[in-house]
Amino acid sequence: MERIPSLASLVSLLIIFATVVNQTRASICNDRLGLCDGCDQRCKAKHGPSCESKCDGPVGMLLCTCTYECGPTKLCNGGLGNCGESCNEQCCDRNCAQRYNGGHGYCNTLDDFSLCLCKYPC
């Protein structure tokens, strides 16, 4: 006799799969908040109830560190004018790196028109 998976089994597998995929996208971040006075309350106020706080460091200089789940870095786009003879691909990348912290640039060409476009964390 062949077993037919029930709808509940399929839904359960889908939920488990979605949870695992979502966990792999999340990263662990740390935020140092200075001295330990009210560390747990400050962490939870800034990063939500699921964060963890700890105080560590040398005696007399304990510092508050919050550990929390953070998502992938969001990328923004910007433009820095035209690409061409005066500014090639390397020039565009260099200009984007100078203008936007962590930025990278590339020349996007459509027909005879070429723009310097930047991607950077925001």
UniProtKB/Swiss-Prot annotation:
The encoding gene is PDF3.1
Name under which the protein is recorded: Defensin-like protein 181
Give me the disulphide-bonded residues.
C29-C70, C36-C55, C39-C64, C43-C66, C76-C122, C87-C107, C92-C116, C96-C118
Q: Which domain of life is it from?
A: Eukaryota
Q: Write out the similarity annotation.
A: Belongs to the DEFL family.
Q: Show the GO cellular component annotation of the record.
A: extracellular region
Record's signal peptide: 1-26
InterPro entries reported for this sequence: LCR
Q: Which UniProt keywords apply?
A: Antimicrobial, Disulfide bond, Fungicide, Plant defense, Secreted, Signal
State its role.
Confers broad-spectrum resistance to pathogens.
Query: Would the keyword Secreted be found if you checked this record's keyword annotation?
Result: yes
Compartments annotated for it: namely: Secreted
A GO BP entry: defense response to fungus
Per the record, the major location class is: secreted
